[in-house]
Amino acid sequence: MLYLLTAFSDGGDIFNLFRYLTFRAGAAFFTALIFGFLFGRPLIDFLRRKQGKGQPIRDDGPTTHFAKAGTPTMGGLLILSALVVSTLLWARLDNPYVWIVLLVTVAFGLIGFADDYAKVKKQNTKGVPGRVRFLIGLLIAALAAIAAAWSHPPDLTLQLAMPFFKDALINLGWFFVPFAMVVIVGAANAVNLTDGLDGLAIMPVMIAGTTLGVIAYVVGNFNLTDYLGVHFVPGTGELLIFSSALVGGGLGFLWYNAPPAAVFMGDTGSLALSGALGAIAVCTKHEIVLAIVGGLFVTEALSVIIQVLYFKRTGRRVFLMAPIHHHFEKKGWAEPQIVIRFWIISLILALIGLSTLKLR
């Protein structure tokens, strides 16, 4: 929105700064961060008053989790609000990719909010039926995939870009739409499964968001894409604003979510942020790279799938408990140990994902 002030610039005043993407990205980061610091405590106090007993704790979970009873959930509202406000302030609102990612984020956030609300109201761990959440998520993802395909340049429409290969594209035809739907919905559910320990999900989300923001900036810059041999998607550089706001809002939330957490992000946050990551990957044509950068989320999701399928087939379990972070808890790892080690893994995977820009 503030980009419109460049119309009043004579080229030598402060309004001219708004032309620069990097300046607006930095401003978006600090806007979201300050928003989180300012409104975090009032929101937590409000949620605690309204929710009473807070987020229900699984009876079959690690016994250490019972100490977290009474902690309010829906803290994702803080991240989501900071992200939306900051993006609307600093991004160019005539950019279709900004709106695609922003609307996907808000839509998945609303699904998560409904789920969190149902859990708190019923005081059990079952909120909105999984099938309902899944079908609504598919509808949102389908609309986003079609909008992204419509916005992409003609030579990239319905194409799948392959990392590590220069200018390698696979024409998926209209199969691109269901593929993109799987990317967005899959990302949403994978991050949701990861959000089981204090600070576990938010830092990997911020790391992935930073990585995808850099990729969006590169992919949207003709000179950089020409140098690196990466496909050029005009306009995606503006998603750096969104990614910067995501990281700023995430840090503001982590201030209150650091162990022992004063608030949980809940599905409100995990579904919103993960939907955003999937949407950015689809817009920038880096869907496969998302699987690398978000490898931790993929591992968490696979651990659940393997556990369920193996148990149905044999009546036995592969892991002591799924998702896999609970397996390590059952083995006696301390919660901070699991969280920090998973953060390190996320950082390594992010660096591998970034390397795909050059290794071609």
From Swiss-Prot:
It comes from Cereibacter sphaeroides (strain KD131 / KCTC 12085) (Rhodobacter sphaeroides). Its cofactor is Mg(2+). GO terms for cellular component: plasma membrane. Catalyzes the initial step of the lipid cycle reactions in the biosynthesis of the cell wall peptidoglycan: transfers peptidoglycan precursor phospho-MurNAc-pentapeptide from UDP-MurNAc-pentapeptide onto the lipid carrier undecaprenyl phosphate, yielding undecaprenyl-pyrophosphoryl-MurNAc-pentapeptide, known as lipid I. Pathway: Cell wall biogenesis; peptidoglycan biosynthesis. The chain crosses the membrane at residues 27-47, 71-91, 93-113, 134-154, 168-188, 199-219, 239-259, 262-282, 288-308, 337-357. This is Phospho-N-acetylmuramoyl-pentapeptide-transferase. It catalyses: UDP-N-acetyl-alpha-D-muramoyl-L-alanyl-gamma-D-glutamyl-meso-2,6-diaminopimeloyl-D-alanyl-D-alanine + di-trans,octa-cis-undecaprenyl phosphate = di-trans,octa-cis-undecaprenyl diphospho-N-acetyl-alpha-D-muramoyl-L-alanyl-D-glutamyl-meso-2,6-diaminopimeloyl-D-alanyl-D-alanine + UMP. GO terms for biological process: cell division; cell wall organization; peptidoglycan biosynthetic process; regulation of cell shape. Belongs to the glycosyltransferase 4 family. MraY subfamily. Its EC number is 2.7.8.13. It holds the Pfam family Glycos_transf_4. Keywords: Cell cycle, Cell division, Cell inner membrane, Cell membrane, Cell shape, Cell wall biogenesis/degradation, Magnesium, Membrane, Metal-binding, Peptidoglycan synthesis, Transferase, Transmembrane, Transmembrane helix. GO terms for molecular function: metal ion binding; phospho-N-acetylmuramoyl-pentapeptide-transferase activity; UDP-N-acetylmuramoyl-L-alanyl-D-glutamyl-meso-2,6-diaminopimelyl-D-alanyl-D-alanine:undecaprenyl-phosphate transferase activity. The lineage of its organism: Bacteria, Pseudomonadati, Pseudomonadota, Alphaproteobacteria, Rhodobacterales.
